[in-house]
Amino acid sequence: MQLTVKALQGRECSLQVPEDELVSTLKQLVSEKLNVPVRQQRLLFKGKALADGKRLSDYSIGPNSKLNLVVKPLEKVLLEEGEAQRLADSPPPQVWQLISKVLARHFSAADASRVLEQLQRDYERSLSRLTLDDIERLASRFLHPEVTETMEKGFSK
């Protein structure tokens, strides 16, 4: 049967699956199509969260049904899983906590949370897109700051 999975951010995909497919298998397919890690997915049908161990037929999900995908923030997933260590390429939790405090002063709790989540996604995306040239440029600036200063002075004249 054909299903449509729509993320809250607007992305969506169509999938062909058997009616008795496991929710966990569907999440794997969604992961491949929308590039959202399985552990960050929460699938909803008519407002009800789907459990990984159940089958689509257990929820009376039929052909041409539309499922909603909620992408859980990575930090929430890590807390739920009880993981103490953060990902190696993420800034220390203190940085996110500090940013969260600053955002809380300027936004409502819900808006601050959404802004922080988007900032974290943008940060991860930026890191994943760094090229070797970008890394070499950054390293040169850190290792030879005097060269960078000289270049900046030359441009400001």
From Swiss-Prot:
Residue runs in coiled coils: none
Keywords: Cytoplasm, Isopeptide bond, Nucleus, Phosphoprotein, Transport, Ubl conjugation
Predominant place of localization: cytoplasm
Cross-referenced Gene3D superfamilies: Phosphatidylinositol 3-kinase Catalytic Subunit, Chain A, domain 1
Task of the protein: As part of a cytosolic protein quality control complex, the BAG6/BAT3 complex, maintains misfolded and hydrophobic patches-containing proteins in a soluble state and participates in their proper delivery to the endoplasmic reticulum or alternatively can promote their sorting to the proteasome where they undergo degradation. The BAG6/BAT3 complex is involved in the post-translational delivery of tail-anchored/type II transmembrane proteins to the endoplasmic reticulum membrane.
PANTHER family hit by this protein: UBIQUITIN-LIKE PROTEIN 4A
Name of protein: Ubiquitin-like protein 4A
Gene name in the database record: UBL4A
